[in-house]
């Protein structure tokens, strides 16, 4: 999965898909009352990027629905996964559950079209801090209680906090998410800084272990060709980048070509790939 990073303006959906992305990452800014409001990252962000592009969240979800609905004039068949990076800086911990419900309501209405011929992309909820696990609980509860349980098949989960994997595992348990139940484990840092592959390799080992909790692993934000190659060789399933074309064009040795290809829609993002 090539994940186009910080796609927060509607026009950027096409821009990043044209560059080779089959997935995008979008920032979702919440109000202090736990309402999803905008697609917005803000300052600081990655080096060499403009940090302040934004859209109203409902309008963005509707544009995203069109981009991922077969038969629509805006349809982009390549776009199969959307990572929602949830910005919770202004949300009280006590409001995390309601924030999850609010996000679920907006996705049902504006992306899934009330469950009728909505967008087909898989949705990965990326929660920045483990202690906000009740956002996931509220999100899942809304879909189950309002008759949209089937849509959970399209939803996965990630805690992006840079902490012990055991702490993240506990977060999923607290949220009611079983081991290997649509879980991605992320690792990374802003492209402004260098980072070793130590934690990424630990996450890959967890994914491949019989008693691990995750299905997939992605690495962010990777722009240098050497770093892209290193992350692929380390076993990452997804590469989050500001330059999808670099991932497409990075030199690949025969061993990489045997093991990896660009993901397609029929490839289940919740299933661990056995090499």
Curated annotation (Swiss-Prot):
Q: Which Gene3D superfamilies match?
A: Phosphatidylinositol (PI) phosphodiesterase
Q: Copy out the cofactor comment.
A: Binds 1 Mg(2+) ion per subunit.
Predominant localisation class: secreted
Top class in the EC scheme: lyase
- Where is the protein localized? Secreted
Gene Ontology biological process terms from the UniProt entry: killing of cells of another organism; lipid catabolic process
Q: What does this protein do?
A: Dermonecrotic toxins cleave the phosphodiester linkage between the phosphate and headgroup of certain phospholipids (sphingolipid and lysolipid substrates), forming an alcohol (often choline) and a cyclic phosphate. This toxin acts on sphingomyelin (SM). It may also act on ceramide phosphoethanolamine (CPE), lysophosphatidylcholine (LPC) and lysophosphatidylethanolamine (LPE), but not on lysophosphatidylserine (LPS), and lysophosphatidylglycerol (LPG). It acts by transphosphatidylation, releasing exclusively cyclic phosphate products as second products.
The record's similarity note reads: Belongs to the arthropod phospholipase D family. Class II subfamily.
Entry protein name: Dermonecrotic toxin LhSicTox-alphaVI1i
Organism, by scientific name, is: Loxosceles hirsuta
Source species taxonomy: Eukaryota, Metazoa, Ecdysozoa, Arthropoda, Chelicerata
